[in-house]
């Protein structure tokens, strides 16, 4: 027999009430937006380690960042860099939102955080230390707690006293986008009043650079790092690795309105998909990208022609950019030519598990400022990409943005 239920669900509206960013082109929201609209490249020679023998000797590192300006030195030593970045970005977002556990029910505030790799530097250093020793298993007691991806949302909740849903999403470059969608749905279904969400990554390490070089995924344009990330350009030849964090406060609309919160935007839908094709290469016709955008539009209850701007995944890889641009034409048809399309990875590099968060923030800021950041470093059209599409090449464009998608 089927069980009867008196449960009637009312889907709640979800808004963004706080933002925080720590990126290669700015260490807070104001600096990040300035870097975006001014077309600043975050790429430069690697300073974290001697990269002389690496195929790629540059990356998008953070600039002028000292963790002890934000976190006590003793506490910082217990955290991998990806967690440190998460703490800094979420502190900014929480302060921006005015949300706290003293004035609001902490059992109804959660943390859902994305990271594609987690504590890679911690893992790398512990293994290197072991390999250099006599075989005795001398490991730091913080090795595992520093390394696991779920430690970032754990540390955030401990600091701020948030006792709602708490977990990490690990889905490679989609990690923080998935975290945002999970947060959206938890609030929609009434399981939380607010959720701190986003993602962080700190993979500019010996292991990170070496591993991605072995995959032939990275640009090797060592003579001109600042022009290496060039999405949709004919001469693109790989992505540029970045690092940092992006944080958003998602909140139930009535809860935000009741406390007089500043509202940046409403999150009206999210889509997820897999192309079930290959471990690294995209489906040649962009099937995964096509399905995820269709799912997003369906979930949001809007039509393709309602969309004004799309911040593409746009990694500057030979196959990926072609596949994603095909998907946009398939989904949006002739309306695709009316949309401002861009890739902020041309400036920030690819932040892996944090990419979705900082790019969602860029889309939100585009709505608030009526300006779409550029896709920099375009020099030569690629005849395999429809260049009648407006990729917002090289210079930001002013326009009204009511609905934006972040891929």
Give the location of each predicted region.
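Glycine-/small-residue-rich "gating" segment that lines the acyl/pantetheine channel
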Residues: 133-140, 181, 185, 201-258, ...
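Active-site-proximal alpha-helical scaffold in enzymes
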Residues: 86-99, 152-153, 157-160, 165-201, ...
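A glycine- and small-aliphatic-rich helix-loop capping segment at beta-alpha/alpha-beta transitions
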Residues: 30-35, 121-136, 186-189, 209-222, ...
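Conserved beta-ketoacyl condensing-enzyme motif
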Residues: 16, 31-33, 37-171, 200-209, ...
